[in-house]
Amino acid sequence: MQVKYIKALSIKRIYAERIVSGAKTIELRKRPIGMELGDLVLLYETAPDSIIRGGFIADKTVSLPISKMWTQYNDVMGVEKEFYDSYFDDCEVAYGTLIYQSFCFRSLSLDQIHKLCPGFVPPQATINWRKNWHFQPEWSEVLSRGRGELIQEGRLHEQLNFFAYQ
């Protein structure tokens, strides 16, 4: 599997649930966090949950002035205006990654992640998945399917190179 296409993103449970349910189809941040079209983004739910149980295939990333981001995307943000304004206080630009597809996965607790992924530290924002870390077969399936659909749509041009995993 090409782990360069897998990221882990720290997120509060409520927003992870909204992403997986489809109520939130853009992930907002104060700065760019390196998600690219076709990446599989694993949602690491922060404490007290400390678990990965969902994710999404990243669509395009947009950056807009705070007011324009709200005007264009508020109906798919999954946040209220008061929270949005507070979160982006003192910022001029908002960054958002649109969500192409979202998924539920078999849960991995932080204890399980530590056992399966040597050196894993919960991300402050995002981290790239490492080659020596565990990955679940379903992650490979959704990554391959999502990227395949983006290729068919003519939006992505790089094919994945998978190798057999024992």
What are these model-predicted stretches?
Residues 2-6, 11-33, 37, 48-53, ...:
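Contiguous surface segments at macromolecular interaction interfaces
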